[in-house]
């Protein structure tokens, strides 16, 4: 099973990716992880990427595509893979197509912006342990305090409303063209066309996961 997972920040992609990977015995692949691993291993592509990143520049699509090809040739990709946060652009999507790297399904988790803002703005974190609470959905026993240590909880900068709205704006700007690219390709069919699956990301984690898995099992 080869899957591309799309969805806004705060949509629960990480949780759902883990469920998909477990069900189909496939690895979750993100470009960030690939870059870090290649730089750490000192591979030729990793060295190229390090030079670019050290100069404060964006890593080119050519390098990213090279890393993707290397990564999906690894033995753990025998059953497929899940791309998380890749492709980010039409150029990268076209690059996958040109390399003959086809996927079975593109899953888009849709959540209204206001729901995302509410979810993320309500998150509170215990810095020492990383324990996460939510003021409405998973509140601590005592307001503003960690259940285990009693230490104060904080709101991460990333979870503040203004930041969340900015990130959502960037997501829509970047991802809408990809949504159209893959949904059009799926509708037209043809060689290598994936199924395009839209999942409403509202409801319990288990409910959303079950809906995704039942759709993927038909892909």
Swiss-Prot record:
Q: Where does AMP bind?
A: 31, 36, 57-59, 85-88, 92, 156, 167
Q: What does this protein do?
A: Catalyzes the reversible transfer of the terminal phosphate group between ATP and AMP. Plays an important role in cellular energy homeostasis and in adenine nucleotide metabolism.
Region: Disordered, residue numbers? 129-152
Domain of life of the native organism: Bacteria
Q: In which pathway does it act?
A: Purine metabolism; AMP biosynthesis via salvage pathway; AMP from ADP: step 1/1
This protein's UniProt keywords: ATP-binding, Cytoplasm, Kinase, Nucleotide biosynthesis, Nucleotide-binding, Transferase
The family note in this entry says:
Belongs to the adenylate kinase family.
Q: Which organism is it from?
A: Alkalilimnicola ehrlichii (strain ATCC BAA-1101 / DSM 17681 / MLHE-1)
A single Gene Ontology MF term assigned here is: ATP binding
Q: Where is this region: LID?
A: 122-159
From the UniProt record, list the reaction(s) this protein catalyses. Answer: AMP + ATP = 2 ADP
Record-level GO BP terms: AMP salvage
* Keyword Cell wall biogenesis/degradation belongs to the record: no
Compartments reported by the entry: Cytoplasm
Annotated Gene Ontology cellular component terms: cytoplasm
NCBIfam families listed in its UniProt record: adk, PRK00279.1-1, PRK00279.1-2, PRK00279.1-3, PRK14527.1
* EC number, as in UniProt: 2.7.4.3
Report the top EC class in one word. transferase
Please describe the quaternary structure of this protein. Answer: Monomer.
Q: Where is this region: NMP?
A: 30-59
Record remark: domains: Consists of three domains, a large central CORE domain and two small peripheral domains, NMPbind and LID, which undergo movements during catalysis. The LID domain closes over the site of phosphoryl transfer upon ATP binding. Assembling and dissambling the active center during each catalytic cycle provides an effective means to prevent ATP hydrolysis.
This protein's name: Adenylate kinase
Q: What is its main location?
A: cytoplasm
